[in-house]
Design a protein with these regions (language model features):
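DNA major-groove recognition helix of helix-turn-helix/homeodomain DNA-binding modules
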Residues: 27, 47-62
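Short, charged recognition helix plus adjacent turn
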Residues: 65-95
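Conserved binding/catalytic microenvironments
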Residues: 96-108, 112-383
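Short basic helix-loop element that most often maps to the first helix and adjoining turn
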Residues: 6-25
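Short C-terminal boundary/hinge segments that cap the last helix of small helical domains
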Residues: 57-72, 273
């Protein structure tokens, strides 16, 4: 897998653009773009990726890659089956019921929990059958609710495996099920899933619009869903260059009302709000604030491996941004990799950090660790 800088240079030349032209189209400086292409600096903002992709007229995944070489082959084989399950089903209820509904409801809950535990291969293997079966029970409200949850799980799994368009198809199917159900809380939950899929596609303006719309009708006492949507508006505001403070403060207040932080598998809790604050600070380029916030978080309080993995990655990004020693950054990334191998190795910002470190290769001891991780990420061949 090529580094992001190498990919950008290849795409720029393919488009027949000079560095000056790309700078003009993206709003970034020629010097900064040159450093990115030559792996002398790491891209540390999603907005930067979006700007470059827009200037090159390519998708975000064309730049970040789909991680095919380094993803879990067992998990990856599920993508075609999931696609078939979604494209061969609808909500017309014409098919005879498959399976016992109570067992399907339990399976939905289990797979959502397993995805949060980074068990991608297991979840991917079992999702297609579950999706097919749930579509045959759509005359029952509980099946529609379960379908909203199952498609949300599907969207997040697909997004994590680089199948961004499939993530949108899954999330949109869940929204269709929620609309059929007609319950505002579930419609808002499904809308949140759509915002996550859109963010994976780089469509942050659209994600913000959907989140803001859902906040108009989500029940006042649905603190977890309201909080997740509010966090989305805050983060997208950061990506779009705005001020996320008000939204993040509001989310923090909502989190105080939540007794069980993983309702609807959203992990909406005070520590998770801090994690979103860290991500927002990183997007603003305020690495010092991100590092300060990260120092206040006990990863154990995040309770699920998927969020712990994300926290370790964001903490590493913050430390890298304030030029802490490579050893400290690597230690966090290696911990993240142990918790969530694929989530860590396919993260574009992790790849950028490792690519830049690899190009520098400081001291021998650090270089050995960098090369090891770069090899596991499929980057060593480009060094």
């Amino acid at each position: 897998m090529d580094s992001i800088g190498t990919t950008i240079r290849r795409l720029r030349r393919w488009r027949g653009l000079s560095l000056e032209q790309l700078a003009g189209l993206s709003g970034l400086s020629k010097g900064y773009l040159s450093k990115i292409e030559n792996e002398r600096t790491a891209i540390d903002k999603r907005s930067t990726l979006v700007a470059i992709a827009g200037a090159l007229r390519v998708s975000l995944s064309d730049i970040t890659g789909d991680g095919l070489e380094i993803r879990d082959p067992q998990a990856d084989t599920a993508i075609p089956a999931i696609r078939d399950a979604l494209l061969s089903t609808d909500l017309d209820g014409a098919e005879p019921p498959i399976g016992d509904l109570s067992q399907l409801l339990s399976e939905t809950q289990l797979l959502a929990a397993l995805r949060q535990a980074n068990q991608d291969a297991e979840v991917g293997a079992r999702l297609p059958e579950l999706l097919m079966a749930l579509h045959t029970h759509v005359d029952k409200p509980e099946a529609l609710r379960s379908l909203v949850t199952a498609t949300h799980t599907t969207a997040l799994l697909s997004k994590g495996l680089g199948a961004f368009e499939l993530a949108w198809i899954a999330a949109d199917r869940g929204h269709e099920a929620a609309q059929r159900l007609g319950e505002p809380g579930w419609i808002a939950l499904a809308e949140f899933a759509r915002t996550q899929a859109l963010s994976g596609l780089g469509a942050h303006k659209r994600a913000a619009k959907l989140a803001e719309r859902a906040l108009e009708y989500v029940p006042a006492d649905a603190y977890d869903v309201r909080g997740a949507l509010t966090l989305t508006t805050g983060y997208t505001e950061s990506v779009l260059g705005g001020d996320a403070t008000a939204a993040l403060d509001e989310a923090a207040g909502l989190a105080e009302h939540v007794e069980y932080g993983n309702e609807n598998f959203l992990l909406f809790s005070p520590p998770n709000v801090v994690l979103w604050r860290i991500s927002s600070a990183l997007e603003r380029g305020d690495h010092a604030e991100a590092a300060r916030l990260a120092a206040t978080v006990n990863p154990a309080e995040l309770t699920i491996d998927s969020r712990r993995t994300t926290f370790l990655i964001e903490h590493a990004r913050a430390l890298y941004g304030i030029r802490r020693p490579d050893e400290e950054v690597l230690a966090l990334l290696i911990r993240a990799e142990k918790l969530g191998r694929i989530r860590t190795r396919t993260n574009p910002f992790v790849r950028e950090i490792i690519s830049t470190m690899l190009a520098r290769t400081r001291r021998e001891g650090v270089a050995r660790e960098v090369r090891g991780m770069a090899d596991r990420m499929g980057l060593l061949k480009t060094a």
